[in-house]
Amino acid sequence: MIPQLGQFKCKDLRCPSCGSGVRRYEEKETDVAVAAKLLELVVTGACDTAMIVSGETDLIPAIRTARRLRPDKKLCVAFPHGRANDAFRGEVHVCFKIRATQYARFQLPDPVVLPDGQTITKPASW
């Protein structure tokens, strides 16, 4: 398994009427990073099966390209709870929903140490 971590950009917003501010974080580059990693793994033959955990339809062009370039590779999509999307049907070999109860049974160990040595710790609320 190769986790693909997202990037989050901080954005400060101001209300045009009252001037009060709020800080928001926007997810950036995640879909592109997942698509690029999918193509890398499939084209180089580093996997026989690729499992994408997402419901983002922005990944469909990369899935189509991967299937066209390497039709021998199996592509699967697992939808996070509440994120199923019919647009993936016919694009991948298998797609299924992850039930909320499955999250507790199939969590990664805590902490997870990435190949570069970075450690990811599970939030206490999980």
What label would you give each PLM region?
Residues 29, 41-90:
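Active-site histidine-anchored catalytic micro-motif
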Residues 1-49, 87-126:
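A charged nuclease-like catalytic/ligand-binding cleft shared by nucleic-acid processing domains
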